[in-house]
C-alpha cells in the first residue's frame, strides 16, 4: 500500500478559489452585459452559481442597460460593423469565463472522489492506494490495511474487469499485427508492425543500402530423428570446429573419406540443380528453402546450414545486393532479379558445399551490367580452379581471381573466404579471393576445400544486417557468387561439385569443354 500526503488544506483552498471564481464570473457577466446590444442578442445564463435574484442589483443593472441601449442605437447607425465585432468578442469572453468555472467545479468534484475510501466511503485523512490500481493509473484509495482486506473481494472485480479489457485489447492488436505481417498483406516499406515480429524488430531503425528488405520468416524446418546430424544440430555450436581451429595444419583426407565427400558433393549438385528449377517470378525464397529441405531429407541427408550458429534455414538465398548468407523468407522473386542459392549437405558424416547465381524470369529484364557481373564471377572461379595443383600456394588463388575481375571493372569482396570442408563444415585452409592476401599453406593431394568468390558491381565493402547473417553491398549495387568444392589430386584438381549434362543452363555459355576435361 502506498502512502499519500494529506490534502485537506488543498481541498479547502480549492473550495475558496472556486467561490471566488463564481463571484468574479457573476461580476464579469454583469459588466459584459452592458456592452451587448440586447435588440440583437439573447443572454443565456449557464452558470448555476451566479445569483440574479437580488432586486437591488437587478434595478441597477436594468438602469445601466437602458442607458447603453440608447447609446447602442446611436452607435448602430454610425458603425454597425464595429458594434457587431464587439458583441462577438464579449460573448466569447463570457463563454470562456463560464467554461473555466465549470471546469473548476469538475476538478473539485474529482478531488472529493479521490478523498473517499473505496471500501467504507469515509473521507480519508491519509490515502493508501492499491498497488495494482496504482500501477495501472486507476484512482482507488483506502483508509487502512484492514479496510483494504475487507473490501478485497469486491475490489478484485475492478482488477478482473481491467484484465479482461487488457486481454481484449491485446487480442485485437494481435489480430491486426498478424494481418499486416502475413505474406499476402506484408508491406516491406512500412516498418510500423515490425516491432511485433521477433525477426523484423531488429531492423526497425536499420539503414538499408539497397532495395531488398527482410520479410517475415516461416517456422524452422523439422528434421526426422533417423537423419544423421552434425554436432551443432541441437546446440548450434560446432564444437569439433572450435577444437580444430587450435591447429594450423590442413587435413589430408584418406581414400575412404574422399569417397564419402564425393558422394555428398554429388547429392549437393543434385540439390542445387533442383533448387534452380524452382526459381521463377512470384516464388518466395521460403518456398525454395522448404522444397530444398524436403529434397535433402528425402535423400537421408542433413542440410548443413540449419542451426549452424543458429542460422534458421536449410539453404542461403541472396538476392540482388545481398552478397551472401541471405535468409530465405516470404519475399517473392521478381523478373530481373539475380539470386544466389547456396547449398550445403551433410551426408555419411561429411559436408559438401556449392552455390550458383541465377537470373530470375526474363533475362532481358536483368540489367546488362548485372549479366556481365554474373558471367565475370563464374569465369573468375573457373580460371582459378584451372591453376590448382599440388605445390600451389593458397594465397595465389586470390591473385588470379582479383586480376580477372579487375579487368572487368568489378571488385572482389574481402570479408569472406573459401575454406576447408569435409568432416567439418568449415576448416583450414582459409582461401581469400583478393590479391595481396596473407593466406598460409600449400596445396597437397587429399586437400578438400572450396573457392567461392563474391564479386560486387561497385565497391568491394559490405554491410552486415542486424540478423547477424545477411551481408549486403555497402553501396546497394549488385553482387554475384559461385562456389565449388575441390579435391587436390596427384596430378591436379577434381571439381567434386561440377555441373552435369542435366544441370539447367545458367543463361550464358559456360564453356564447359574448357573446364570439365
Curated annotation (Swiss-Prot):
The record's annotation in CDD domains points to:
MetAP1 (cd01086)
Residue ranges, annotated region (Disordered)? 74-94
Give a yes or no for keyword rRNA-binding in this entry: no
Q: Name one GO cellular component term.
A: cytosol
**Residues bound to a protein:** 325, 426
- Kindly state what the record says about how the cofactor is bound: Highest activity with zinc and cobalt ions, and low activity with manganese or divalent iron ions. Binds 2 divalent metal cations per subunit. Has a high-affinity and a low affinity metal-binding site. The true nature of the physiological cofactor is under debate. The enzyme is active with zinc, cobalt, manganese or divalent iron ions. Has high activity with zinc; zinc cofactor is transferred into the active site region by the ZNG1 zinc chaperone.
What does this protein's UniProt record list under function?
Cotranslationally removes the N-terminal methionine from nascent proteins. The N-terminal methionine is often cleaved when the second residue in the primary sequence is small and uncharged (Met-Ala-, Cys, Gly, Pro, Ser, Thr, or Val). May play an important role in parasite growth during the blood asexual stage.
Q: What is the name listed in the Swiss-Prot or TrEMBL entry for this protein?
A: Methionine aminopeptidase 1b
The record lists the organism as Plasmodium falciparum (isolate 3D7)
Q: Which gene encodes it?
A: METAP1b
Amino acid at each position: 500500500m502506498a502512502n499519500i500526503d494529506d490534502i485537506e488544506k488543498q481541498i479547502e483552498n480549492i473550495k475558496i478559489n472556486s467561490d471566488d471564481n463564481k463571484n468574479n464570473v457573476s461580476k464579469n457577466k454583469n459588466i459584459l452585459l452592458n456592452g451587448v446590444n440586447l435588440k440583437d442578442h439573447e443572454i443565456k445564463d449557464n452558470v448555476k452559481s451566479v445569483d440574479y435574484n437580488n432586486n437591488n442589483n437587478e434595478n441597477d443593472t436594468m438602469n445601466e442597460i437602458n442607458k447603453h441601449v440608447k447609446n447602442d442605437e446611436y452607435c448602430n447607425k454610425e458603425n454597425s460593423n464595429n458594434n457587431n465585432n464587439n458583441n462577438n468578442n464579449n460573448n466569447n469572453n463570457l463563454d470562456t469565463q463560464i467554461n473555466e468555472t465549470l471546469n473548476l467545479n469538475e476538478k473539485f468534484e474529482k478531488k472529493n472522489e479521490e478523498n473517499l475510501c473505496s471500501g467504507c466511503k469515509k473521507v480519508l485523512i491519509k490515502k493508501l492506494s492499491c498497488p495494482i490500481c496504482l500501477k495501472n493509473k486507476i484512482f482507488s484509495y483506502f483508509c487502512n490495511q484492514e479496510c483494504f482486506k475487507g473490501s478485497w473481494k469486491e475490489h478484485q472485480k475492478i482488477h478482473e474487469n481491467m484484465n479482461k479489457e487488457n486481454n481484449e485489447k491485446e487480442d485485437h492488436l494481435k489480430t491486426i499485427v498478424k494481418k499486416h505481417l502475413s505474406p499476402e498483406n506484408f508491406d516491406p516499406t512500412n516498418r510500423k508492425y515490425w516491432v511485433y515480429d521477433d525477426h523484423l524488430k531488429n531492423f526497425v531503425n536499420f539503414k538499408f543500402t539497397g532495395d531488398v528488405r527482410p520479410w517475415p520468416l516461416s517456422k524452422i524446418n523439422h528434421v526426422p530423428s533417423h537423419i544423421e546430424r552434425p554436432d551443432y544440430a541441437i546446440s548450434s555450436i560446432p564444437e569439433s570446429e572450435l577444437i580444430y581451429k587450435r591447429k594450423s595444419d590442413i587435413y589430408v583426407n584418406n581414400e575412404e573419406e574422399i569417397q564419402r565427400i564425393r558422394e555428398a558433393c554429388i547429392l549437393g549438385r543434385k540439390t542445387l540443380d533442383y533448387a534452380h528449377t524452382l526459381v521463377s517470378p512470384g516464388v518466395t525464397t521460403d518456398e525454395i528453402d522448404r522444397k530444398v529441405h524436403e529434397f535433402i531429407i528425402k535423400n537421408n541427408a542433413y542440410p548443413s546450414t540449419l542451426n549452424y550458429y543458429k542460422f534458421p534455414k536449410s539453404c542461403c538465398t541472396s538476392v540482388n545486393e545481398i552478397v551472401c548468407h541471405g535468409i530465405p523468407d516470404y519475399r517473392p522473386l521478381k523478373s530481373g532479379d539475380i539470386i544466389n542459392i547456396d547449398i550445403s549437405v551433410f551426408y555419411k558424416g561429411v559436408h559438401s558445399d556449392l552455390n550458383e547465381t541465377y537470373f530470375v524470369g526474363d533475362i532481358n529484364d536483368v540489367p546488362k551490367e548485372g549479366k556481365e557481373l554474373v558471367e565475370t564471377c563464374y569465369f573468375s572461379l573457373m580460371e582459378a580452379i584451372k591453376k590448382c595443383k599440388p605445390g600451389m600456394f593458397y594465397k595465389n588463388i586470390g591473385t588470379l581471381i582479383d586480376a580477372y575481375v579487375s579487368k572487368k571493372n568489378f571488385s572482389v569482396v574481402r570479408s569472406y573466404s573459401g575454406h576447408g570442408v569435409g568432416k567439418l563444415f568449415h576448416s583450414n585452409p582459409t582461401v581469400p579471393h583478393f590479391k595481396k592476401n596473407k593466406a598460409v599453406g600449400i596445396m597437397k593431394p587429399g586437400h578438400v576445400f572450396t573457392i567461392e568468390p563474391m564479386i560486387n558491381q561497385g565497391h568491394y565493402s559490405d554491410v552486415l544486417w542486424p540478423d547477424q547473417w545477411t551481408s549486403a553491398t555497402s553501396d546497394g549495387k549488385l553482387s554475384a557468387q559461385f562456389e565449388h568444392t575441390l579435391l587436390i589430386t596427384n596430378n591436379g584438381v577434381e571439381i567434386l561439385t561440377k555441373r552435369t549434362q542435366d544441370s539447367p543452363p545458367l543463361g550464358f555459355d559456360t564453356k564447359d569443354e574448357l573446364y570439365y576435361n
